């Protein structure tokens, strides 16, 4: 602090401009504050008109309750609000705005005109302010019941801030995204947007389930709904509903992720962590999941006053919320089966499908076996085995038996078909299923393509399966079940590893010692800032134990839980499954292919391999007709 400076009060104008730096970053920030005010007023129709990306003009007009004439000057004052009266009101606030800062901040960096009329008023009133002159001017005006706020020349009096604005298209894209989020949060409100005199969209009130789905399709694109799972789960005072995209409908950017807490759009680290865990082993590397999800909970259990723009929230029971989100999404993705995805006739946009029953089956060692072989198998080559190390806990050994790569003769293939479709007693003639309802979701195998793909026919059309990717997922899920049932064996260290931590980390390690024990670790506190690692999971003996424990402790302190150990274990199991899965260029008999299809139908997450790639795709009859220009 310099010796010549004296402490003095800031002028109201300067104080508001400083506050505007937190609230008003760009035209999209202004739109967010004005639209939230409109929603809080009970509006059922909101019109937004924009010029030059919102820099020259941003006008928001609603049919809400309006503002009384005597309250108009107060509406532009700092910390003037109708939402709360006492501190206790803040603990359970449901309104989107409550601080009373937005209009004052906006009016300090732009030319603002507010016109409003209440239902019991004979006429409307208007108040104007300009950045330099913070004194509001009130006068009569013509306006229906509701409120209009017009913001012109944003940052006209702060050139330094204006320099940081991007191109018109960029600013408008940000503004449009704000409106999209609010339109998803409030299906009961109509939103209408115009830019430079052109109508961008008109979203009418969505009062039923079909209308809500249409709005989601308009905002997120029709492809999202076709590749999304509707969910609605309620437990322990929490309700999660909405749509979660299938792993095959992922994005290169996290630009189709909408999460709302009690109607408020949020971007929260705890939520992001739970979603990331749920998609952990079904998403391709570098891809992002898609979702539109709504969490409803007791407002007193959520603190919304932790960020200037209210984008972040804090949950009183963060661990419970995290586990609820993760469990709900994880189960929803795991429960997907082909029959769920093929309930309706396929359209062109429904070609890519995830999958997830049993004529034959895969044996526990990963080799395919049939309930009753229909043709004599050639002499197998010596078995190759994959063994992930030796020692305690490494008893998982998975083998596969490669088959000769020569294709079956045509006559032998026909014999396979006759015997496969023949009744077990051999008395009735062979026949295909009599109705579409008898055909399994993934149908019956027709042929193998290039030793890589299985071509099958189901009630919809053709199915193509990547046999290695599909078998890899089946093996992986069985390995996880086996590990969960047999438990994790630990391997004691001859020389315990000493780990230097902060006191907070050491406290966390001591508090979660039993949790670590269940995962195969044994930690012992040696001092205020020292912990010894005495045992590690046998399957992770090649891992860097010190680094892993530190990363897990960081997660535990941040989120109250961690999936890092499980992620390491799953990575190892995934490698084992990959080595044990049937390889490309291995020729399969028709019954073997059908065995794989039935296992896919019974396996969780079988729509993606362990690396997130799709395992099968559907091509309906309509798609084939289009290829050959039939019906035109």
Swiss-Prot record:
GO CC aspect terms: mismatch repair complex
Show which residues constitute the signal peptide: none
In terms of superkingdom, the source organism counts as: Bacteria
PROSITE patterns per record? DNA_MISMATCH_REPAIR_1
One Pfam entry for this protein is: DNA_mis_repair
Keyword DNA repair in the entry? The reply is yes
An example Gene Ontology biological process: mismatch repair
Q: Mind listing the GO molecular function terms for this protein?
A: ATP binding; ATP hydrolysis activity; ATP-dependent DNA damage sensor activity; mismatched DNA binding
State the InterPro entries in the record: DNA_mismatch_repair_CS, DNA_mismatch_repair_MutL, DNA_mismatch_S5_2-like, HATPase_C_sf, MutL/Mlh/PMS, MutL/Mlh/Pms-like, MutL_C, MutL_C_dimsub
Q: Which NCBIfam families has this protein been placed in?
A: mutl, PRK00095.1-2
Q: What HAMAP family does the record point to?
A: DNA_mis_repair
Q: Which family does it belong to?
A: Belongs to the DNA mismatch repair MutL/HexB family.
Give a short account of what the protein does: This protein is involved in the repair of mismatches in DNA. It is required for dam-dependent methyl-directed DNA mismatch repair. May act as a 'molecular matchmaker', a protein that promotes the formation of a stable complex between two or more DNA-binding proteins in an ATP-dependent manner without itself being part of a final effector complex.
Q: Mind telling me what this protein is named?
A: DNA mismatch repair protein MutL
